[in-house]
Amino acid sequence: MRSAIRWAVVGLLIALAPGIARPAGPTLTVFAAADLAFAFDELVPRFERVAGAKVTLVLGSTGNLATQIEHGAPADVFFAADQAFVDRLIAQQVLIAGSRALYAQGRLALATAKRLGPKLTDLQALLDPRIRHVAIANPEHAPYGRRAEEALRAAGIWEMLESKLVYGENIRHTLQFVQSGAAEAGLVALAIANVPEVEWVLIDASLHSPLNQATAVVRWSPRPELGVRFIQFVNGPEGRAIMKRHGFLLPGEF
């Protein structure tokens, strides 16, 4: 009940915010993994114009969003950073199985604060004494955090780095640690790594399990057809072009 009230208040505040021009029509509430922040910032307004609908976007870690949906949060569509969370909710009959679709594969990047000097080029460089803090998303509920842990373990440096680690609540929060100077480096989503304060290199994908990202419509959505239409837009020509520009691999490429 508290979750439902909280998200209702969030939606009301967004709707009443001054100076925000929003199209008339039905409202679609999309719960989306935080790595989609930049891509969906570009994609959502285009869908709103095409569909004549409004989209309320709620970003967070996939695990936390999944828990909120399980407890009845008023989401219409769930975009996860790891397909396992979608499949779990389908098995629980929380999401509609027939609406499930892969939409991207995420990529992990090593981000270095520009103020540190030359960017780090591999994970072993995190052992440099200049690196006092390394940011990763919380592996308990964030897929990028789990993959970061896998990569650091595969590189043989997890135990040596544990005392340096700081944990973001989601992958955007993790990047903010590096942007703000709270951490000298971090393992972040490539899709959000292009910010002025950091430099980045891709992490070898063989060091972690793939970040295959999936979506589905929530069973109690009052507008499932609009949810399916949004998924189709993301996976359509215009949506795919936007996702590609933001560093995602697309279905058919993995």
Explain the meaning of each model-derived region.
Residues 1-6:
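Positively charged n-region of N-terminal signal peptides that target proteins for export
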Residues 7-17:
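Bacterial N-terminal signal peptides
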Residues 20-73, 80-83, 87-96, 101-254:
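Exported/periplasmic ABC-transporter solute-binding proteins
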